């Protein structure tokens, strides 16, 4: 058994000299592996008398256990040293300023659309949408604007061909909705519209929202009450509001709505009116039974008035100095 003690001492010396986990594993294989020095000692038991074998086997197992404990202890030391070295190399200077978190924000026009949708949603309106590439029937003819009508010249329309165009208004959504369902109807139709115009108060693409109610016994009084409540909610002021007679081919009577500005001048904010009987007939609704009102407003214009923006083009230039003001 003196030879066994020498093997244990040799193994412990090799273990203490192992500089990393890989070298330590080589020592383990050399002494405790399938053909390791200590493992092979078990084969010598067959040379002993049967009555001596249990005691000799226990001594060999004890030697193997000593080596295994030495391996475990050295492995823990090496892993701890490696961790400390890595932590030292990855030291964080806690005195450095942290990275600033940039929070995004909704575009001011999106804020306006969301605010208006929320208000009318509480009144039972649902949001309806339609295609931006329209045909002249839904954009003009069904809205009481036939081909010879002078109002067509006011739109500066982007035409693809003689029948297809970029919609100049979201009114086509109203037509599609009235054709698809019978009254009562209560919708708002937000979306992008297009007109060939570009200056301080106009862009070729802008956002519009129209509203429509069709039901029995709908009157101009209902229209006025709805828009009064909306404008005072939107601007969060008890505004002075006036309805000024106007003309739109698809409503009769028609009006434009103005609010009194802080400078003492009237500011136009939207157009409205009672749905023209011809429009109702065009979609298969009997104007003798049903009536309705409609209104339309530009989202950029309302946003300009709410936030005091003077140039509509600012909404489309993606200038962060401008957009960050609305976070």
Swiss-Prot record:
GO molecular function terms attached to this record: ATP binding; magnesium ion binding; phenylalanine-tRNA ligase activity; tRNA binding
Catalytic activity: tRNA(Phe) + L-phenylalanine + ATP = L-phenylalanyl-tRNA(Phe) + AMP + diphosphate + H(+)
Gene Ontology CC annotations of this record: cytoplasm
Pfam families linked: Phe_tRNA-synt_N (PF02912), tRNA-synt_2d (PF01409)
Enzyme class: ligase
Cell location: Cytoplasm
Binding site for Mg(2+): 252
Nucleotide-binding found in the keyword field: yes
Alphabetically ordered keywords of this record: Aminoacyl-tRNA synthetase, ATP-binding, Cytoplasm, Ligase, Magnesium, Metal-binding, Nucleotide-binding, Protein biosynthesis
Main location: cytoplasm
Record note on quaternary structure: Tetramer of two alpha and two beta subunits.
PANTHER family from the UniProt entry: PHENYLALANINE--TRNA LIGASE, MITOCHONDRIAL, PHENYLALANYL-TRNA SYNTHETASE
Protein family per UniProt: Belongs to the class-II aminoacyl-tRNA synthetase family. Phe-tRNA synthetase alpha subunit type 1 subfamily.
Name listed for the protein in its UniProt record: Phenylalanine--tRNA ligase alpha subunit
Organism the protein comes from: Shigella sonnei (strain Ss046)
């Amino acid at each position: 058994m003196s030879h066994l003690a020498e093997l244990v001492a040799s193994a412990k010396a090799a273990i203490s000299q192992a500089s990393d986990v890989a070298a330590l594993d080589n020592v383990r294989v050399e002494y405790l592996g399938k053909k390791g020095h200590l493992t092979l000692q078990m084969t010598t038991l067959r040379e002993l008398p049967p009555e001596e074998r249990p005691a000799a086997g226990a001594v060999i197992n004890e030697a193997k256990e000593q080596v295994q404990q030495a391996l475990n202890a050295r492995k823990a030391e090496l892993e701890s040293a490696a961790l400390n070295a890595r932590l030292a190399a990855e030291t964080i200077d806690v005195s450095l300023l942290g990275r600033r978190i940039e929070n995004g924000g909704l575009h001011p026009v999106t804020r306006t659309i969301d605010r208006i949708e929320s208000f009318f949603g509480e009144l039972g309106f649902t949001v309806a949408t339609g295609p931006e590439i329209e045909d002249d029937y839904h954009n003009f003819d069904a809205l009481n604007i036939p081909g010879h009508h002078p109002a067509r010249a006011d739109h500066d329309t982007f035409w693809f061909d003689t029948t297809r165009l970029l919609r100049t208004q979201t009114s086509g959504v109203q037509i599609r909705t009235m054709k698809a369902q019978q009254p009562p109807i209560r919708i708002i139709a937000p979306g992008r519209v297009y007109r060939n115009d570009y200056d301080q108060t106009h862009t070729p693409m802008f956002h519009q929202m129209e509203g429509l109610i069709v039901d029995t016994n709908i009157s101009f009084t209902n229209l006025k009450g709805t828009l009064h409540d909306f404008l005072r909610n939107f601007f969060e002021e008890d505004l002075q509001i006036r309805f000024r007679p106007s003309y739109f081919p698809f409503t009769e009577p028609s009006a434009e709505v103005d609010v009194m500005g802080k400078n003492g001048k009237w500011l136009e904010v939207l157009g409205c009116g009672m749905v023209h009987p011809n429009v109702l007939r065009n979609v298969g609704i009997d104007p003798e039974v049903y009536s309705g009102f409609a209104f339309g407003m530009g989202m950029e214009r309302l946003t300009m008035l709410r936030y005091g923006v003077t140039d509509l083009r600012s909404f489309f230039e993606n200038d962060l100095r401008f957009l960050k003001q609305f976070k």
